[in-house]
Amino acid sequence: MQKKLLEIIVCPFCYTRLFMNDTETELICNIENISFPLKQGIPVLLKNQIRYLNCKIIDNQ
């Protein structure tokens, strides 16, 4: 995926910046805890393509 596109693309739900995962196969929204797949370098920002991410809750006690 082109770096310029990554700088301007946002989550279609909360409008925050998306980040590439380590394997460069998904775009991640840290606010919504979801990811969107990349198909041949093209982001698929459709609701039916979302993958919900597991989030860890840290207990400070």
Swiss-Prot record:
SUPFAM superfamilies: Trm112p-like (SSF158997). It comes from the Bacteria. InterPro entries: Trm112-like (IPR005651). Pfam families: Trm112p. Belongs to the UPF0434 family. This is UPF0434 protein Bfl377. It comes from Blochmanniella floridana.
